[in-house]
């Protein structure tokens, strides 16, 4: 009986070891892959009616491919290629870069939006996933007109 009591009695060293293992397991669970990584690049300032090129680079850390739709939204209406929407298959080994050329004569806030969508005929064999947690990602920049 005494041997059984020793076996079930937790020493401080054992408790410390279990605590460290638990903390390590929780930290490892925080290392999740990013669904969308985006880099939106526009000039900070331009002169009125100068051509502006907006560049959006998109990649993922997921192992599965996704169908994405990218587009721009502005605080004031802009014409031309600004309104183009791009649809593409995004995979971890194949990042995408999108370009928009437009003109403006007013200071404007611009949001680059990436939606993960369900659409057939974009990814090979229609093999694509849709994240449960988030399916819309965006970033905003301000374009100053001097």
Curated annotation (Swiss-Prot):
GO terms for cellular component: extracellular space. The keyword Disulfide bond applies. It is found in: Secreted. Keywords: Disulfide bond, Glycoprotein, Pyrrolidone carboxylic acid, Secreted, Signal. The keyword Signal applies. Pfam families: SVA. Residues 1-28 form the signal peptide. One of its GO terms (biological process) is regulation of immune system process. The modification Pyrrolidone carboxylic acid is found at residue 29. It comes from the Eukaryota. Glycans are attached at residue 105. Disulfide bonds join 65-91, 89-123. One of its GO terms (molecular function) is aspartic-type endopeptidase activity. Belongs to the PIP family. Monomer. Interacts with AZGP1. This is Prolactin-inducible protein homolog. The gene is PIP.
């Amino acid at each position: 009986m005494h041997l059984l009591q020793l076996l079930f009695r937790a020493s401080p060293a054992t408790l410390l070891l279990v605590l460290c293992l638990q903390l390590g397991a929780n930290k490892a669970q925080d290392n999740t892959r990013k669904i969308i990584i985006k880099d939106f690049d526009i000039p900070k300032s331009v002169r009125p009616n100068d051509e502006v090129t907006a560049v959006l680079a998109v990649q993922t850390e997921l192992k599965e491919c996704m169908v994405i739709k990218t587009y721009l939204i502005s605080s004031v209406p802009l014409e031309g290629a600004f309104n183009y929407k791009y649809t593409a298959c995004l995979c971890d080994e194949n990042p995408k870069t999108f370009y928009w050329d437009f003109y403006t004569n007013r200071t404007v806030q611009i949001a680059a939006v990436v939606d993960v969508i369900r659409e057939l005929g974009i990814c090979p064999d229609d093999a694509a996933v849709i994240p449960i947690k988030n399916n819309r990602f965006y970033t905003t920049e301000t374009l100053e007109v001097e």
